A protein has these predicted regions:
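Long, hydrophobic/aromatic-enriched structural stretches that serve as scaffold segments
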Residues: 7-8, 24
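Active-site loop segments of alpha/beta catalytic cores
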Residues: 15-170
Length: 170
């Protein structure tokens, strides 16, 4: 557990998204040893092998902008919020694609996301806002993995999400 100290994207502009120093999804150091370790665990143990590529775009974008700013973006500047989520997700999916190439069929489960969409008593966003802004990106994410690996997909979400559970199952 950690507390967010500073959010790096201060402005709600496309230029701010472009200026941000995004990670290089093709940095070979990110994947060093992944193929060998996955193969070893798959062949030499009885454990389920889980690839953790967490594409939690909702929470990460809230951290990039600051929680309050991001929620304001979703409500008042959805074009910017969607551009930020799309940029983040593009990078995470490139990382996932490269990781999947490395591990091949040596995984049993892929950790798709851990976006917390609920609070103690309700969803963070209205079901309408979820459906319009978040669900299409989740669908893109889930379809990405469904199309690339037979591994089971693992999705984690905290909170009271009953109003959107059918959307998540879909």
């Amino acid at each position: 557990y950690y507390d967010l100290n500073r959010s790096p994207i201060k402005e709600d502009t496309m230029a701010a998204i472009e200026r941000h120093r995004w990670p290089d999804p093709y940095d070979s150091g990110r994947y060093r040893g992944l193929r060998e370790r996955a193969r070893e665990l798959h062949k030499e143990t009885d454990f389920a092998v889980v690839l953790q590529v967490n594409c939690a775009f909702f929470l990460r974008c809230a951290e990039l902008r600051g929680w309050e700013n991001f929620y304001m973006d979703l409500a008042g500047n959805p074009k910017f919020a969607c551009a930020l989520m799309d940029r983040y997700l593009d990078i995470r999916l490139r990382i996932a694609e490269k990781a999947l190439e490395e591990v091949g069929d040596n995984i049993d489960i892929v950790m798709v996301s851990s976006d917390d969409l609920g609070m103690n008593d309700r969803t963070i966003l209205s079901p309408k806002m979820y459906s319009e802004l978040i669900k299409p990106r989740q669908k893109r994410t889930f379809d990405f993995f469904k199309d690339r690996t037979p591994a089971k997909r693992f999705y984690h979400c905290d909170g009271a999400i009953y109003p959107i559970i059918e959307d998540l199952i879909e």
